[in-house]
Amino acid sequence: MKRIAKWLGGLVIVALLGAAVWLAVAPPAMIRVATNYAAKIVCSNVFIAGRSPEAVMATDVQAPGHPIFKAINVAVDRTASPPRVTARLLGFSGTGEAVWRGERLGCSSLPEGEIADASMPDGVSREPVTGAADKLWPEGERVDPSQAPEIADILDDSALGGPGMRAIVVVHGGRIIAERYGDDFGPQTPLLGWSMTKTVTAAILGTLVKDGRLSLDRTGLFRSWDGSARADISLASMLEMSSGLAWNEGYGTVSDVTRMLYLEPDMAAYAASKPYDPENGNPDGDSRFNYSSGTSVMLSDVWMRAVEAPVSYPWRALFDPLGMSSATFEMDAAGTFVGSSYMYATARDWARFGQLLLQRGAWNGRSLLPSGFVDWMTEPASASETAWGGHAYGRHVWLVGPRGSVPRGEDPEAAFDLPADTFWLRGHDGQTVTVIPSRDLVVVRMGLTPSDRNYQPQGLVDALVKALAGQ
């Protein structure tokens, strides 16, 4: 019996050693996704937002995430060249890395340990406009908040602000009339927009359409598509998420989107490699509507190939004219802007971008976007028709707010009375910018609010619309 027990014990030890070697040498993709995600989120929040790595791990990575994150440790090396964050499961498995590229370019994930050089040219500064502290927003940073008690009551209502709220900014008549911030966050804290970045990507494309360097009917977007049906895919169809390319946007496992963001050094090349599959669609809409972060990254690659000095172009064409001095637009390891997901800015700067859309692309007497471009962005894309009869999407903007607990196939706005011209920028974990031109209203709401909390910011916006109308 003792001999059998020793033999079994030996087998257990060998199995454990084998498992440890396997985890160290060839960790599963899910572990590598988790460690690269942790490294990237910590890197960006430490170096862009000035937060502590401990707070970011506890609040942003571990609290809302998969149980695997509880077993991940991160280390921040500020003295490395470039500075970097390393994450490992149990301290040894599935090493994930992210490096700090510098001001305005933030952090990049390094799924294969290498990074293409990309630096901001001289003369592109992120310093705020001279005298910004004394000028009213949006020309500067001074805010005279509304004294209306009904507006204050709405912003102080935690149910309307939602769980995990980090920032609310209300713009009416072109001025900030009220704002609120969560604990440890404030007007100067850059916040990740996640998929709100997609709308920024569309606007950058719009600046090039205005200058005649791109056209919406352009096809043949990637050389690898030559000779296939993909060669006929146009910029317009990509902007309305109806390219017909296969894509899985699920975040619960190793899907197309998680593989792209955390395992692929060249995200655009990975997305462009997907096959043409027009039947791969969204269950809520037409078979050709398929929401895809890969599409938005490919669009970044397209516009970057259309300009000289592409690294500084978003600032020259958009952020600097708007006074968005906090804007940080991050790249993949290959040096392509992650136009689907990775832009940080303060809530006030996200509001500036929303105000640009409200003003149909005009800013300080200058047209940054082509005439009619924002109207085109906010027209219903036919491919996004839903089971409840409306349209969910335009061109890289949403026409409806988040679903919350509303069942699929039903109108997520049915419980609210929002104006018909309302449109949305929407991002993961509760990021929204709501634009209502008919009410001269922009509402920014940002936070860490996972979808399983079933929060709908429509309630906040609806209450503000009614209060401002005196209802």
State the predicted function of each range.
Residues 174, 191-217, 238, 299-303, ...:
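Active-site SXXK
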Residues 201-202, 294-304, 341-363, 431-447:
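Active-site-proximal alpha-helical segments within enzyme catalytic domains
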Residues 226-287, 294-297, 345-348:
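Conserved catalytic neighborhood of penicillin-recognizing serine enzymes
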Residues 210-246, 276-281, 305-345, 372:
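Active-site helix/loop module of the DD-peptidase/beta-lactamase fold
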Residues 30, 422-471:
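Structured C-terminal helix/loop/strand segments within mature extracytoplasmic catalytic/sensor domains
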Residues 324-331, 379-442:
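Active-site Gly/Thr loop motif
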Residues 134-173:
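Beta-lactamase-like hydrolase cores
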Residues 151-157, 175-180, 254-284, 309-327:
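Short, charged, amphipathic alpha-helices and their helix-cap/turn boundaries
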